[in-house]
């Protein structure tokens, strides 16, 4: 028997950010400075929210505890992980602890963290991978807006990451016909996105 676990809702495509209605009093968790997060939040069209932007790269359980300690009493309606894997990993773990739903919005691509049941956090200085259905997003929003303005180096690394993830998933002993179908479609999209018009030279 095979089991496929995915978020309750996945919204993807151009303008997915702006066409989503966000609950009032949401807590947005990110790693980026205000000059960038302000631009992203304006694109989202979110009005009533709290912002926590102190998450560090490669976060630890201490980052999770800091979010819970500061915001649990403020009773946010939902936690929104906006950014790379660091902010999403923190929200994945913190939201169940606060008994709140979570929205994950990746600003890069490649790992697919927004649709997995995995959160990677440092515990006592050591990276630890947590696996649990409670870590799945309630809503994942994937919008190409972020990639259009991303530095080339991030696009390149994300594309390489996506290729590696697809290859690993396709060859996984836990794979099945459904996951292999998704991998094949991903390879098709990657070929179109990574190769240039003459199909001979890799843009990367």
Language-model features and meaning:
Residues 1-78:
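ATP/NTP phosphate-donor binding region
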Residues 9, 25-27, 77-80, 101-106, ...:
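Structural motif
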Residues 35-38, 61, 86-93, 112-115:
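Short glycine/serine/threonine-rich phosphate/pyrophosphate-binding segments
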Residues 67, 90-95, 166-167, 187-193:
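Buried hydrophobic packing segments
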Residues 71-94, 98-107:
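A short, small-residue-rich loop immediately preceding and capping a beta-strand
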Residues 186-204:
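Oxyanion-binding "anion nests"
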């Amino acid at each position: 028997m095979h089991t496929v676990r995915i978020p309750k809702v996945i919204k993807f495509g151009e303008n997915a950010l702006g066409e989503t209605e966000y609950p009032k009093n949401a807590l947005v968790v990110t790693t980026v400075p205000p000059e960038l997060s302000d631009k992203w939040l304006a694109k989202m069209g979110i009005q009533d929210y709290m912002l926590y932007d102190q998450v560090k790269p490669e976060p630890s359980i201490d980052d999770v505890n800091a979010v819970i300690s500061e915001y649990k009493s403020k009773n946010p309606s939902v936690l929104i992980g906006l950014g790379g894997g660091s902010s999403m990993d923190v929200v994945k773990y913190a939201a169940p602890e606060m008994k709140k739903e979570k929205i994950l919005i990746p600003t890069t691509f490649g790992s697919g963290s927004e649709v997995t049941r995995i959160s990677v956090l440092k515990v006592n200085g050591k990276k630890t991978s947590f696996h649990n259905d409670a870590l799945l997003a309630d809503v994942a929003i994937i919008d190409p807006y972020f990639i259009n303005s991303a530095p080339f180096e991030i696009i390149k690394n994300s594309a390489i990451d996506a290729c590696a993830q697809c290859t690993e998933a396709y060859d996984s002993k836990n794979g099945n016909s459904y996951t292999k179908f998704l991998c094949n479609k991903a390879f098709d999209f990657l070929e179109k996105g990574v190769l240039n018009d003459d199909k001979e030279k890799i843009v990367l």
